[in-house]
Amino acid sequence: MERITLDKIKADENIRALIDGANNNLKEMGYTEHGLRHVGYVSRTTANILRELGYDERTVELGAITGWMHDIGNAVNRKNHGLTGATLAFQLLDNMGMDMREIAVVIGAIGNHEEETGVPVGAVSAALIIADKSDAHRSRVRKDSYDSNDIHDRVNMSINL
């Protein structure tokens, strides 16, 4: 099995296409930014949480990989995007040659990061949930779809006032 790194994940055109597709779909639905800025933030923050808690560097890197890929299911549909994303991630990571035990960590976290249905199923999963939900920034609000009744838009717009 090949050791898959975050750099390999970031360089993969299929993963990039799914991130872009997810972001475009969510833009059309009026959701906040879910593109490279968001996945970069979630990737870094997931890794930082795990590092601060004393996890080994491979677990930290798996957290970073998970953060980068966590929203690819939105390229298909917003509803159940965690489960769809886990299925997509399985195929992509398996094709890249990642160890199946590591794939299980990544897809378990992706499949459980949605607030409606997910629960933290391990350290990477818990760190991902915290990192994802902590991403609040004015730049996430799309200028053409700001909704003062949407809690996500209100929180994001309150940053840096």
Question: What residue spans do the PLM features occupy?
Answer:
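Non-catalytic interface/linker regions that flank or bridge core catalytic/transmembrane domains
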Residues: 1-17
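Serine/threonine-rich low-complexity intrinsically disordered regions
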Residues: 2-5, 43, 160
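N-terminal glycine-rich anion-binding loops that anchor highly charged ligand groups
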Residues: 13-21, 58-61
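Electropositive phosphate-/nucleotide-binding environments in soluble metabolic enzymes
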Residues: 16, 36, 40
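Short hinge/gating elements
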Residues: 23-31
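N-terminal low-complexity or amphipathic/hydrophobic leaders
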Residues: 41, 45-49
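Divalent metal-dependent catalytic cores for phosphoryl transfer on phosphate-bearing substrates
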Residues: 27-28, 38, 51-161
